[in-house]
């Protein structure tokens, strides 16, 4: 029987490497109803929050990659994201 080799020492990853972008999003600290308004409701407050968010670009990339059809993601509405995908914006 051959003894097992000791496991190599692994340095822990820095916190920012293990954080999900969603954990750093300003919307995670806000009422979600602002980001999913009723039809015809205002999106102004949600978009204002997004504009000051450090992960806005990651959020928008996620929404586009996952075809999110509802709510404000990365500062854009569903309609604005559709236009962006079609190259209109």
Curated annotation (Swiss-Prot):
Changing residue 27 to A: Retains chaperone activity. May be phosphorylated, possibly on Ser-42. The cluster is degraded quickly in the presence of air. Upon cluster removal intramolecular disulfide bonds are formed. One of its GO terms (molecular function) is dinitrosyl-iron complex binding. It is found in: Cytoplasm. Residues 1-24 are annotated as: Disordered. One of its GO terms (cellular component) is cytoplasm. Keywords: 4Fe-4S, Chaperone, Cytoplasm, Disulfide bond, DNA-binding, Iron, Iron-sulfur, Metal-binding, Phosphoprotein, Transcription, Transcription regulation. InterPro entries: 4FE4S_WBL, Whib. Acts as a transcriptional regulator. Probably redox-responsive. The apo- but not holo-form probably binds DNA. This is Transcriptional regulator WhiB2. It comes from Mycobacterium tuberculosis (strain ATCC 25618 / H37Rv). The lineage of its organism: Bacteria, Bacillati, Actinomycetota, Actinomycetes, Mycobacteriales.
